[in-house]
């Protein structure tokens, strides 16, 4: 992929020192997925994928059960998936994914976060073309060669397999998430350190110390917003 790997879980743990924020975001996403179809991951592919991702963040069962029960019962909240694109200092690019029951509030909050922290919002498509939607898996205990050979034996295509530190990273097409994960399990993988959808930048940029400080404030401001689920960017943070 030509890009340094940033461990999603470690990044989230650093940014979200209060894990309740992560749990709240997954609770909302699980509710929406369960409400969109059957509240059973065996028959609801969207719900299954969210639950697989939630495992890698150690989301407690009571959070998951509460969200699914809410979808089964009287939960009548409707949420929209929104994507915002924008720019930070020195050509940095950001994609902000949100899940909201109040579009006007979210748009205003995201715009304010950009404006107050050295950035500005762009129009739809102004940034996304520089990123690739990717299913990403992180595994310990197996080499890239072993994983690639095992996947080839199962006739499973992936974009790339690399090693970064203690992790072997598998990049795949997003619509192949479940297929690739099942294939990896067939190779003996029992635990995924990462199982996530990402928007990966095609190229990274580096910022000056001052610009990076501004950029990190922008990221923090966006991730602090209640409706924001994910923030992706093209900066190689030092």
From Swiss-Prot:
Tell me the GO molecular function terms.
DNA binding
GO CC terms, sorted: cytosol
Q: Does the keyword Secreted apply?
A: no
Main localization, broad class: cytoplasm
Q: Which UniProt keywords apply?
A: Cytoplasm, DNA-binding, Transcription, Transcription regulation
Please name the InterPro entries in this protein's record.
Answer: Integrase-like_N, TACO1_YebC-like_2nd/3rd_dom, TACO1_YebC_N, Transcrip_reg_TACO1-like, Transcrip_reg_TACO1-like_dom3, Transcrip_reg_TACO1_YeeN, YebC-like
GO biological process assignments:
regulation of DNA-templated transcription
Its annotated compartments are:
Cytoplasm
**Which Gene3D superfamilies does the entry link to?**
1.10.10.200, 3.30.70.980
Stated family: Belongs to the TACO1 family. YeeN subfamily.
Please give the PANTHER family that the UniProt record associates with this protein. TRANSLATIONAL ACTIVATOR OF CYTOCHROME C OXIDASE 1
Do you know which NCBIfam families this protein is assigned to? PRK00110.1, PRK12378.1, YebC/PmpR family DNA-binding transcriptional regulator
Q: What is this protein called?
A: Probable transcriptional regulatory protein SH2225
């Amino acid at each position: 992929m030509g890009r340094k790997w940033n461990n999603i879980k470690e990044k989230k743990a650093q940014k979200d020192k209060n894990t309740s924020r992560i749990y709240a975001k997954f609770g909302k996403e699980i509710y929406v997925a369960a409400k969109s179809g059957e509240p059973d991951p065996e028959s609801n592919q969207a719900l299954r994928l969210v639950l697989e991702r939630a495992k890698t963040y150690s989301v407690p069962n009571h959070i998951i059960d509460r969200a699914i029960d809410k979808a089964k019962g009287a939960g009548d909240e409707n949420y929209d998936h929104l994507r915002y694109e924008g720019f930070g200092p020195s050509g940095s690019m950001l994609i902000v994914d949100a899940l909201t029951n109040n579009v006007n509030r979210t748009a205003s909050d995201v715009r304010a976060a950009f404006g107050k922290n050295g950035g500005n919002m762009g129009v739809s498509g102004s940034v996304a073309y520089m990123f690739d939607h990717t299913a990403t898996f992180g595994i310990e205990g197996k080499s890239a060669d072993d994983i690639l050979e095992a996947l080839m034996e199962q006739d499973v295509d992936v974009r790339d397999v690399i090693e970064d530190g203690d992790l072997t990273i598998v990049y795949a097409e997003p619509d192949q998430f479940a297929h690739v994960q099942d294939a990896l399990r067939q190779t003996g993988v029992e635990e995924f350190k990462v199982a996530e959808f990402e928007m990966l930048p095609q190229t990274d940029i580096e910022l000056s110390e001052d610009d990076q400080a501004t950029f990190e404030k922008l990221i923090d401001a966006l991730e602090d917003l209640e409706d924001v689920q994910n923030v992706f960017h093209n900066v190689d943070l030092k």
